[in-house]
Design a protein with these regions (language model features):
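Phosphate/adenylate-binding glycine loop and adjacent helical scaffold
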Residues: 197
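Conserved small/polar residues in nucleotide/adenosyl-binding loops
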Residues: 300-306
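A conserved mid-domain beta-alpha-beta active-site/ligand-binding segment of alpha/beta enzyme cores
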Residues: 228-275
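Short acidic, glycine/serine/threonine-rich loops at helix termini
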Residues: 89-91, 121-124, 149-153, 202-208, ...
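Immediate flanking context of iron-sulfur cluster ligation sites
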Residues: 186-189, 283-298
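Flanking helices and flexible, charged tails adjoining ferredoxin-like Fe-S electron-transfer domains
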Residues: 1-3, 52-136, 146, 159-164
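A short, acidic, amphipathic alpha-helical segment used as a generic capping/interface helix at domain edges
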Residues: 272-288
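Iron-sulfur cluster-binding cysteine motifs and their immediate structural context
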Residues: 2-13, 17-42, 46, 50-66, ...
Length: 308
């Protein structure tokens, strides 16, 4: 970790061909090629994963935690995002996915979508009471976008809505609830986010939005998806604890879902780090004053190579 910031993106020198595809893809110019190999300029990297998606030689991976690390806790909670459910065929029931997570060793499942519902209300209330400040306001939920603002557009930090991201809100609530219900101590409870992108992995280890995270680690969505597929089937156990989100919370996993859940009509949804960059540039030039809110997410698809 250089410059005081942890990164989940790792460059594998042995597989790098020096083709500069990653250099061209990086929105913050955080990669350079020296002596035929790509190198990361860590102070500029925002962990958006754009380099990872573009590399054709599998020379870039995203580091996540291993499922085996859950064994150090007495009680483990999975935080699945809406995007996990979207990986499965439409005929796959949520109950079947929950059962798969239980069989992987999780004692409880708490949908991030539940927290998204409450955060949507907070965003709507903040927007309603926001008077006289510069617009548009900007979504706080994507760590890569927050890092991009810090690195390239620091003047926009004051326009980021000051609410907890749903993942962190879910972790705080469910850990406290389990402590009260079971009598277990905080250090005996593991909270694991099933992460769809590298920036969320990095954010757990060194957060850009909270001082002390309640999330113990992240597990790659692609790895968990594969493991669930292998163990799916059989009888679903009814005695396991599941807190499921509604369609409003689940809508956060789709384009424009955050705007819809918060009831924002005069908003703009932007997905994909390059499009987000372009919009932030326009906002910094004060050219989007007529827009109330920008939903901004760095990724457009979710299957990422990992270090597994």
């Amino acid at each position: 970790m250089a410059g005081g910031y942890f990164h989940s993106i790792r460059l594998l020198r042995s597989q790098c061909q020096g083709c500069v595809t990653c250099v061209k893809a990086c929105p913050t110019e955080a990669i350079r090629v020296r002596n035929g190999k790509a190198e990361l300029i860590e102070a500029r990297c925002i962990d958006c994963g754009e380099c990872l998606r573009r590399c054709g030689y599998h020379a870039i991976v995203a580091e996540t935690d291993k499922l085996e690390e859950t064994e150090q806790f007495k009680y483990n909670i999975a935080l699945p995002p809406p995007s996990l459910y979207a990986q499965f065929p439409p005929e796959t029931s949520a109950a079947a996915i929950w059962e798969g997570l239980h069989r992987l060793g999780f004692d409880e499942i708490f949908d991030v979508a539940v927290a998204s519902e409450y955060i949507s209300l907070e965003i709507a209330a903040y927007l309603k009471n926001y008077n006289g400040g510069r617009k548009p306001l900007i979504s706080c939920t994507c760590p890569a976008v927050l890092r991009l603002i810090q690195v390239k557009f620091p003047e926009l930090i004051k326009q980021v809505v000051p609410v907890l991201p749903p993942t962190e809100a879910a972790a705080i609530y469910v850990k406290n609830e389990v402590m009260q219900r079971t009598g277990l101590k905080s250090e005996e409870i593991g909270v694991w986010f099933i992460a769809p992108c590298p920036s969320k992995n990095a954010n757990i280890r060194q957060s850009v939005d909270v001082r002390h995270t309640q999330i113990n680690g992240s597990l790659s969505i692609s790895e968990i998806y594969g493991k669930i597929l292998k163990i799916m089937g059989g009888e679903i156990q009814p005695d396991k604890k599941v807190t499921a989100g509604s369609s409003y919370g689940m809508s956060w996993g789709s384009y424009g879902g955050e705007l819809e859940a918060a009831g924002i009509e005069n908003g703009l949804a932007v997905h994909g780090i390059n499009d987000v960059y372009d919009v932030l540039e326009q906002i910094s030039l004060n050219k989007m004053r007529d827009v109330d809110y920008v939903e901004s997410v760095s990724y457009t698809h979710l299957t990422l190579p990992t270090n597994s």
